[in-house]
Amino acid sequence: AKDVSEFDTLDELKADIKKKLTEQAEAAADNEVENSLNNSIIDKLEGEIPEVMYENRITEMVRDWEFRNRYQGITVKDYLKYTGATMEQFRDNFREAATKQIKLRLALEKIAQYENIEAAEEEIAKHYADLAEEHKMEVEKVKNIISVEALSEDIKVEKAFNFVKDNAEIAS
């Protein structure tokens, strides 16, 4: 075991493998529960959602795609050229995810409102600090980019999801 791993004995190696497999299985199960909850929340959302909300989210997703692929030297223009797709087809690739995200966000905002879920000043400060650390920026720069209102809404949505998750009856 020592020759092929950082462990001194085969038993230690087996225990580590078992632990990692258990962690992966638990993460997959948690992910499945979250996806199921998301779908349940979305299914319960009623009312018309303006198309412009979907279009705006798709535009954000295209911008995110551009940002992620910029470092590999791939632009949307290049992608369209290589794939033979139109900009409309490219944007349509994001439509399903954008639709789910918008519906989920609206439903969770409504739950947060209904349950009087708020974002405490300490939570907002912690999120700013976490974002600053994650992006290797000063907190003040992050505050200039993300408004207190926007961050507060994100925190309330996150707390609303946790509220739903904590109160959901999950069948195994």
Q: What residues fall within each predicted segment?
A:
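Extended, charged alpha-helical "arm"/coiled-coil substrate-binding scaffolds
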Residues: 1-172
